[in-house]
Regions:
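Alpha-helix-loop-beta-strand connector modules within alpha/beta enzyme cores
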Residues: 46-70, 124-131, 135, 211, ...
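Active-site mouth loops of central-metabolism enzymes
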Residues: 5-19, 73-81, 161-172, 232, ...
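Internal, glycine-rich beta/alpha segment that forms the wall or movable "lid"
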Residues: 76-183, 213-216
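An alpha-helical appendage that flanks or caps ligand/catalytic pockets
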Residues: 30, 119-158, 194-285, 295-301, ...
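Hydrophobic faces of well-ordered beta-strands that scaffold small-molecule active sites
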Residues: 3-7, 35-39, 68-71, 98-102, ...
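N-terminal beta1-alpha1-beta2 module of alpha/beta enzyme domains
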Residues: 1-62, 163-165, 292
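Short, acidic/polar
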Residues: 15-29, 83-86, 169-179, 267-278
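Acidic (Asp/Glu)-rich catalytic clusters
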Residues: 26-30, 56-65, 87-98, 181-182, ...
Length: 311
């Protein structure tokens, strides 16, 4: 079983401390129980949030072994050429520690703010992933797509990891999960997916993986499955933990989102351990813990008190 912790991108009080940011990564790595740290992407919105790629790069400079990822980059809003270059660069300077989560973002993303037409976003997503992989693996790329065209171009350096960093797909609808398994190297359940819904997504992913002649797992050639978990622990008052995480989610999204609130895990230590075990039983081989308040304190409590109960 593997465990990960979120990169603390949110600072609801508007105050950001670079020193605290560095200390967080150093402390997370020192615990030795977190394999990786993950950002998420929300460029526009009501809550102050650091950009994922830059936060990952800073984290790489503060650590030596912690793997670094984003779940997910909304790749329909990115140039695949620039994203391929940026992630290859970070993989080089971090010594091969990059994990890349990708997703289409859905039809309600602010495409107009990026000067991108909203129609054909799924085709744009699929084509973009194909182009990223080509730039990462081929010495010279000729690509004649609907959205991007390249003729005999090279992108160097390639990523440090060979053939390339693992591409995780993030999505929830059955068709999206099937598409993601075909395109990517791992499935990452969203923090907004309740455990029962995640279990159904895992079943879909496993079926497609089996049809492709693969196995689920973290071994060579295998297809891993993970899940983000929004979490709040209160040693003495589980209802207070629930209220606080619901308030934090409302600040992050700008309004109450009952579906996401129902997917979050909150309560006493014992209640949280039981709920996380259910996520593991549903098929998660890695759990990404995402506290939204008192983040350094939660990171330490999860490492020293919660994870030992799950081992």
């Amino acid at each position: 079983m593997r465990f990960a912790i979120s990169i603390p991108q949110f600072f609801g009080d508007g105050e950001f401390s670079p020193a605290d940011f560095r200390a967080y990564f150093e402390r997370a790595e020192a615990f030795g129980v977190y394999e990786s740290a993950w950002a998420q992407e929300m460029t526009l919105g009501p809550s102050p949030q650091l950009a994922p790629l830059e936060a990952m790069t800073y984290a790489a400079a503060c650590t030596s072994s912690l793997r670094l990822g984003c779940t997910v980059f909304v790749t329909t809003l990115h140039s695949p050429v620039q994203l391929a270059k940026d992630l290859a660069t970070l993989d080089q300077v971090s010594g091969g520690r990059v994990e890349a989560g990708v997703g289409s973002g859905g039809p309600r993303r602010p495409f107009a703010a990026y000067g991108i037409p909203a129609d054909r976003y799924l085709a744009r997503f699929t084509e973009g992933i194909r182009l990223v992989k080509a730039l990462w693996t081929e010495p010279s790329v000729t690509f004649d797509g609907e959205f991007w065209q390249l003729k005999g171009v090279a992108m160097e350096p390639k990523p440090y990891q060979k053939p390339h960093p693992r591409l995780w797909f993030g999505g929830s609808a059955e068709a999206a999960v099937r598409r993601g398994v075909r395109l990517c190297d791992g499935f990452f359940g969203a923090g907004s997916s309740p455990t029962a819904a995640f279990a159904a997504q895992v079943a879909t992913a496993r079926a497609v993986v089996a049809d492709r002649g693969q196995r689920v797992g973290f071994g060579p050639g295998e297809f891993p499955i993970a899940k983000r978990v929004y979490i709040a622990i209160d040693p003495s008052d589980g209802s207070r933990a629930r209220q606080r995480i619901n308030d934090a989610l409302a600040r992050m999204y700008g309004h109450r989102v009952p579906a996401i609130e129902s997917a979050a895990i909150a309560g006493t230590l014992g209640e949280c351990a039981e709920a996380v075990r259910a996520v593991i039983d549903a098929g998660a081989e890695m759990v990404l813990f995402t506290p939204l308040f008192e983040v350094p304190e939660h990171m330490e409590q999860i490492a020293t008190e919660l994870i030992p109960q799950l081992a």
